[in-house]
């Protein structure tokens, strides 16, 4: 079987299975997810041993420490994955709900029913937890899924899919619900993107080049999960102690993830007081790159270049800019943002409302860290990614975002 036939076969199996699985009961889907959670806990040592193969290989290729952190699985993270599957199992699914029903003058009853999308493909990079999250969310929402992870996590993903398949078959269902493309050749992705007859939606989750390639070349409808060039703006009426805690968390709690803050904007009226505190807080932890005005206050900083304002670092680097007004901060963010997550720190209600109304991003915060843009933190159990587009879904993609609707019409012999 050549590469083209291999990928096509995976997609066909998912499509064929989806017709039956889409009508599975909620009880059955919960049972599958409970078994997945149990199997993850029972196979921790196996998962870790396979993950270590990926980690060692990544170290040998010079992968950065922040990206290695994305790849790493340990006892604690596997437990968290298993708990996440349990949370997804307990979520209230909208599949099968009739959200509206109305009667026409001719007696027809017309309703709108929530149904699964069908077959979802997801292309992702070095985070093996996505394998479990994606499978769990698709199963809960009645979808079949085609997984294509990155080559750097191939051993981890193979192990996780094997465990997921064991759980599905233990529950009495076909393992074809979850398909995994083991071929790491990028040509497999090219073939996958052509299969619009079998796959209903494609979700790319990774770096800018992966997303750009998918959006430009996929024949399948795409839900775009964008990069996270996230901003924190500290207003002139901010509580500075609160601001310090939020900026610290947003930047260094986990810099390799898409909801980490990459840019810090500071109002000119508080810059001379606030910036030295930030510099002291981040000294030897974060490389700060400042605008011209910032360098006058903290000359030890590295000078920011134009490309810094649009760069998602995913590392211990942050660019800092002093702004004259909230209006300037909003304009700067809307110009350079990837439309992911932005935050304002202020005690002024009017300014906060202006920021909420005028920032054009998927998640906009007042006095909280951007790190909360996450399916679990939003109460979704997990997420397929963070959508930065506006059509179909925006923000964390949970189970209800993996559905569509169809009309059901009840008649009594009406003709037109």
Swiss-Prot record:
Subcellular location: Cytoplasm
Catalysis: reaction(s): L-glutamate 5-semialdehyde + phosphate + NADP(+) = L-glutamyl 5-phosphate + NADPH + H(+)
Gene3D superfamilies from the UniProt entry: Aldehyde Dehydrogenase, Chain A, domain 1, Aldehyde Dehydrogenase, Chain A, domain 2
GO cellular component, one term: cytoplasm
Keywords per UniProt: Amino-acid biosynthesis, Cytoplasm, NADP, Oxidoreductase, Proline biosynthesis
Pfam family of the protein (one): Aldedh
Record carries keyword Secreted: no
Classification via InterPro entries: Ald_DH/histidinol_DH (IPR016161), Ald_DH_C (IPR016163), Ald_DH_N (IPR016162), Aldehyde_DH_dom (IPR015590), G-glutamylP_reductase_CS (IPR020593), Glu-5-SA_DH (IPR012134), GPR_dom (IPR000965)
UniProt-listed GO biological process terms: L-proline biosynthetic process
Enzyme class: oxidoreductase
Pathway: Amino-acid biosynthesis; L-proline biosynthesis; L-glutamate 5-semialdehyde from L-glutamate: step 2/2
Molecular-function GO terms, alphabetical: glutamate-5-semialdehyde dehydrogenase activity; NADP binding
Annotated EC: 1.2.1.41
Record SUPFAM superfamilies: ALDH-like
Family: Belongs to the gamma-glutamyl phosphate reductase family.
PANTHER family: DELTA-1-PYRROLINE-5-CARBOXYLATE SYNTHASE, GLUTAMATE SEMIALDEHYDE DEHYDROGENASE
Functional description taken from the UniProt entry: Catalyzes the NADPH-dependent reduction of L-glutamate 5-phosphate into L-glutamate 5-semialdehyde and phosphate. The product spontaneously undergoes cyclization to form 1-pyrroline-5-carboxylate.
Official protein name in the record: Gamma-glutamyl phosphate reductase
Organism name: Petrotoga mobilis (strain DSM 10674 / SJ95)
